[in-house]
Amino acid sequence: VARRGARKQTPAPSRLILDSGAVIALARGDQRARGFIERAIETGCEVLVPSVAVAETVRGRGPRDAPVNRILAAIDSVLVADEAAARTAGDLLGATGTDETIDALVVAGAILAGGGRILTSDPANIKKLARATPEITVHRV
């Protein structure tokens, strides 16, 4: 029985956050990565890429980067690494004793977006950084 005046809780939208390894896997036609994207589309899941993953994967706009640029053009949004993300990443690095700044910025972006699933080719580092954040799950591409 709902209390009178109580606001109905709505779940946070589902998010799929792609790190650079996931973007590269998609650009190469990796079937496992495509499966994650297909399920995201089927379920209305928002697909995001941190700006640091864009920097890691793009080397120009020429033919060599065409597959990566096609993937990035289809993404719902880019998670910008602003001061809040940088500070959150710094907190994660301090709490875990790691020095994987790019991975920390990926996790920080996911935290600030409200959680979600991170698709990565390097789950060990991402899991370590996200271990205290239950609203984030990590999946290997």
PLM features: residue spans?
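Acidic, metal-associated active-site segment
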Residues: 57, 100-117, 125
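Short, polar loop motifs at secondary-structure junctions
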Residues: 62-63, 121-125
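Acidic catalytic patch
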Residues: 75-96
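Short, well-structured N-terminal submotif of metal-dependent ribonuclease cores
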Residues: 1-49, 58-76
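Short hydrophobic/aromatic-enriched beta-strand-loop microsegments
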Residues: 135-141
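Short loop/helix-cap segments at secondary-structure boundaries that form the rim of catalytic
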Residues: 126-133
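Short beta-strand scaffold positions
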Residues: 49, 80, 101, 120-121
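Alpha-helix capping/helix-boundary segments
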Residues: 22-23, 53, 85, 105-106, ...
